[in-house]
Amino acid sequence: MSDVEIKVENIVASATLGKSLELPKIAPALENVEYNLEQFPGLVFKLKDPKTAALIFGSGKLVCTGAKCIEDSIKAIHMTVDKIRELDTEIPEEFEIKIQNIVASANLGKVLNLEAVALDLENTEYEPEQFPGLVYRLSDPKVVLLLFGSGKVVCTGAKTADQALLGVQKTKERLIELYLIEE
């Protein structure tokens, strides 16, 4: 595989507590929380360490965003649930945490002619009047890459950092195969 490094920019993880939550009671008891039902149907609970935001919904679902590694994402969800459990002792000890999306960035180190890439590379969308990047969809791993003329890449849709890395590596190799960039 080609040598390219990725940087994880954001991880989105979710958890289902299996119990509905009384947000009007929880909101005033938490620090660093935003709760405005007219603007958003849940609480936004911000943690400083790890620096994340947890979206807490009345259905008992949580979404954590902002972590840079899976461990921090899991830690943030557990910290959030522990805070909620202080207010509601019926919150189950066991719950499933699912990684929903990993966003990573990379730099191919080469300028890309996106017009040529759009013509030669399969499964792409490129409309420069609407968005400056080219959208490239891979099926294995199932990720979407945004390619920019500068050679910078954003990979989204991965469930693991390895999937994001593999997506970027496969993309670079395909661009080399098609003579769209040099090795």
Swiss-Prot record:
Signal sequence coordinates: none
GO BP terms, alphabetized: DNA-templated transcription initiation
InterPro entries: TBP (IPR000814), TBP_archaea (IPR033711), TBP_CS (IPR030491), TBP_dom_sf (IPR012295)
SUPFAM superfamilies assigned: TATA-box binding protein-like (SSF55945)
MF-aspect GO terms: DNA binding; DNA-binding transcription factor activity
Sequence repeat boundaries on the chain: 8-84, 99-175
Keyword Methyltransferase attributed: no
Alphabetically ordered keywords of this record: DNA-binding, Repeat, Transcription, Transcription regulation
Transmembrane segments: none
Function per UniProt: General factor that plays a role in the activation of archaeal genes transcribed by RNA polymerase. Binds specifically to the TATA box promoter element which lies close to the position of transcription initiation.
Similarity annotation: Belongs to the TBP family.
NCBIfam families, per the entry: PRK00394.1-2, PRK00394.2-6
Protein name in UniProt: TATA-box-binding protein
